[in-house]
């Protein structure tokens, strides 16, 4: 399950692009907290801490503004087109016990049968879970699966507090036969091509002579 990350914040009292640039120059990030019908709360967040927290899109943050905590999840991160810089963050307020719809990464474990290979067709699944009990990933066990077998979204084991939102028939893992490349034929073709080439006739002139 994800941990709640406490982030210190200050209220934003000025607005405009110029002010936002000055904020980012001081390794801070402008952000807004909204949701549940409350007035949007504009804040300034610490850049390094938020850069780390934003690596997990389902992280639950406890934004501490003047001693008051605000539980929130990252809704959107606006990044610079070229530089590794966060320009702005939208945070969605959540409440303890509230269920949220999130995308969870799929982790494959185990090895298929020796005569087979597996292909991951879907890297994430959409689920509904308690905001404070969102799993970091969903495990898909492919141990000893044979050629022609499949794992669908409905086959993935979910924690007790999690329900599937994605299409149950969504293909997650496909087990197939390895595709063999006939290197013998390719080698013969190359040899035939080489035998068919005729050496270029010498003109007696050095390359680059235009006289």
From Swiss-Prot:
It comes from the Bacteria. Gene3D superfamilies: Ribosomal protein L25, beta domain (2.170.120.20), Ribosomal Protein L25, Chain P (2.40.240.10). It comes from Kocuria rhizophila (strain ATCC 9341 / DSM 348 / NBRC 103217 / DC2201). One of its GO terms (biological process) is translation. Residues 179-194 have a biased composition (Acidic residues). The keyword Nuclease does not apply. GO terms for cellular component: cytosolic large ribosomal subunit. This is one of the proteins that binds to the 5S RNA in the ribosome where it forms part of the central protuberance. InterPro entries: Rbsml_bL25/Gln-tRNA_synth_N, Ribosomal_bL25/Gln-tRNA_synth, Ribosomal_bL25_b-dom, Ribosomal_bL25_C, Ribosomal_bL25_long, Ribosomal_L25_dom, Ribosomal_uL5_bac-type. Belongs to the bacterial ribosomal protein bL25 family. CTC subfamily. Part of the 50S ribosomal subunit; part of the 5S rRNA/L5/L18/L25 subcomplex. Contacts the 5S rRNA. Binds to the 5S rRNA independently of L5 and L18. SUPFAM superfamilies: Ribosomal protein L25-like (SSF50715). Residues 175-211 are annotated as: Disordered. Keywords: Ribonucleoprotein, Ribosomal protein, RNA-binding, rRNA-binding. PANTHER family: RIBOSOMAL PROTEIN L25/GLN-TRNA SYNTHETASE, ANTI-CODON-BINDING DOMAIN-CONTAINING PROTEIN, RIBOSOMAL PROTEIN L25_GLN-TRNA SYNTHETASE, ANTI-CODON-BINDING DOMAIN-CONTAINING PROTEIN. This is Large ribosomal subunit protein bL25. GO terms for molecular function: 5S rRNA binding; structural constituent of ribosome.
């Amino acid at each position: 399950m994800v941990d709640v990350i406490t982030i210190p914040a200050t209220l934003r009292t000025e607005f405009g692009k110029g002010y936002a640039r000055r904020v980012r120059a001081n390794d801070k990030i402008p952000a807004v907290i909204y949701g549940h019908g409350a007035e949007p709360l504009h804040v300034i967040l610490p850049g390094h801490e938020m850069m780390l927290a934003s690596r997990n899109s389902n992280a639950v943050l406890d934004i501490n503004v003047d001693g008051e905590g605000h539980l929130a999840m990252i809704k959107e991160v606006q990044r610079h087109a070229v530089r590794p810089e966060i320009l702005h963050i939208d945070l969605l307020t959540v409440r303890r016990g509230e269920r949220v719809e999130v995308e969870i990464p799929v982790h494959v474990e185990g090895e298929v049968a020796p005569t087979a290979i597996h292909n991951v067709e879907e890297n994430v699944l959409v689920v509904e879970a308690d905001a404070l009990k969102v799993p970091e990933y969903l495990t898909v066990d492919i141990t000893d699966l044979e050629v022609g077998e499949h794992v669908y979204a409905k086959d993935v084991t979910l924690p007790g507090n999690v329900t599937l939102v994605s299409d149950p028939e969504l293909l997650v893992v496909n087990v197939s036969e390895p595709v063999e490349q006939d290197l013998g034929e390719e080698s013969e073709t190359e040899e035939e091509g080489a035998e068919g080439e005729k050496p270029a006739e010498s003109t007696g002139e050095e390359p680059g002579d235009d006289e």
